[in-house]
Every structure is written in C-alpha cells, then in structure tokens.
From Swiss-Prot:
Pfam families: Trypsin. Monomer. The lineage of its organism: Eukaryota, Metazoa, Chordata, Craniata, Vertebrata. Keywords: Disulfide bond, Glycoprotein, Hemostasis impairing toxin, Hydrolase, Protease, Secreted, Serine protease, Toxin. This is Snake venom serine protease ussurin. The active site is at H43, D88, S182. It is found in: Secreted. Residues 1-227 form the Peptidase S1 domain.
Length: 236
C-alpha cells in the first residue's frame, strides 16, 4: 500500500496473508469471510499456498496467529481463463476451520454495493514504494475513494464496458494498493466491497486508480458454493 500508515493491529482481523511453502514472502492478501472460507483474487492461485491468519508483524508474530492450507479452491472461470479485466476471484476452503481470537475474525459479505464517493480502506503487506519495492514488516492501510468507473475506462481504454469491477483510488494520486496487495480487501463503511486485483505499472499515479473485483456482484455465487452447491455459476 502506497501512501498509507501501519494498520491498527485490531482493524484487520479478517485480513490473511498468502505465501508458498517455497517462498516465505507474502505475495498476496485475502479475506476471511467465515470460519472456513477465504476470498482472494484468482491470479493469487499457486500450487502450495499457505494461509497466515491473525498476522500483524512478520518478525514478531501474534501469539494467536494460525497457518492453514486450502482444501478446495473455486473459481468463477477455470483458474486460467479469467481475463486480466474480469472475474478475478477465488474462494478457498480451509482444511481446518479457525476459531475467532484476539486477532482473527471474519468479515461479512456486503449487503449493498458501494456508492461513488465512498471512503474505503485498502490494506496489505504489499510494497510501500513503487518503482523499487520495499516490503514492510506490518500491513499498511490507506483511505481511498470509490471513483466513477469511467475514470478507470479513461485510464485503461481496454477495460470492458460491463462492470463487475470497482474503480478506486485518489484522483490526484499518492495513495493506492500496489504489488503484493492483490487479493486483499477493500473495506467501505465497514463493508467488504472489493478484492484488489490490478493497477498501473507504477502505483499511486494521478488519474490511474486501482481495479477491485466487486464482491457484491458475486455474493450469490459465494453463498451457493459455501452452502455446498459447487456447480453454482458465476454472474455473466
């Protein structure tokens, strides 16, 4: 996260970090939506995913931090056919559920979509500088705004007209999610509204906001899968 500050240790109990058995570094974020399920971006899929819950500082782990592996993964499209612009969402079922604790608690799915102008909080262990990467020990948080989708279409002309995507950032630049924040949550007015998935090569530039999968549009799909209907189809 560019232009943010260290998150309050108590404000991100639902934030998880993804790493692989090979590389110890957190490469993506994710969001705990109940005791057994994590939502992230499809492009965060890897062979040997490890999921860290209840983390704040990597160097000094919380005593209630937990590690899990996924038992099942679900994609809107087969994991490799989502496009750069569309349906970048993955639901992972934990092999063992986690209990709520001081630093672990799920966030609920949104009951309404966010409106343009909403103030939202983006968070993650991604780089805090853009051209050279600097990975922080603790997650950083920044407040950004939901912008009109047309702002993103102006910045990225190849964006499709249909929108299951939120456009969010600061028009004048300076605050943004960045490399390593993908898959993590965008929280607007206390509701989990977006999954970070794409931004310009240099983060936090003026008029180049980030793109976030619009969680609200996928709530039926998510709830169907969680309730056992694994053939549920994604919104078109």
């Amino acid at each position: 996260v560019i232009g943010g500050v260290e998150c309050n240790i108590n404000e991100h109990r639902f934030l998880v970090a993804l790493y692989t058995s090979r590389s110890r570094r957190f490469y993506c974020g994710g969001t705990l939506i109940n005791q057994e399920w994590v939502l992230t971006a499809a492009h965060c899929d890897r062979k040997n995913i490890r999921i860290k819950l209840g983390m704040h500082s990597e160097k000094v782990p919380n005593e209630d931090a937990q590690t899990r592996v996924p038992k099942e993964k679900f994609f809107c499209l087969s994991s490799k056919t989502y496009t750069k612009w569309d349906k970048d969402i993955m639901l992972m079922r934990l092999k063992r559920p986690v209990n709520n604790s001081t630093h672990i608690a799920p966030v609920s799915l949104p009951s309404n979509p966010p409106s343009v102008g909403s103030v939202c909080r983006v968070m993650g262990w991604g780089t805090i500088t853009s051209s050279q990467e600097t990975h922080p020990d603790v997650p950083h948080c920044a407040n950004i705004n939901i912008l009109d989708y047309e702002v993103c279409r102006a910045a990225y002309p190849e964006l499709p007209v249909t929108r299951r995507t939120l456009c969010a950032g600061i028009l004048e630049g300076g605050k943004d999610s960045c490399n390593g924040d993908s898959g993590g949550p965008l929280i607007c007015n206390g509701q989990f509204q977006g999954i970070a998935y794409w931004g310009a090569d240099t983060c936090a530039q003026p008029r180049e906001p980030g793109l976030y999968t619009k969680v609200f549009d996928y709530t039926d799909w998510i709830q169907s899968i969680i309730s056992g209907n694994t053939d549920a189809t994604c919104p078109q």
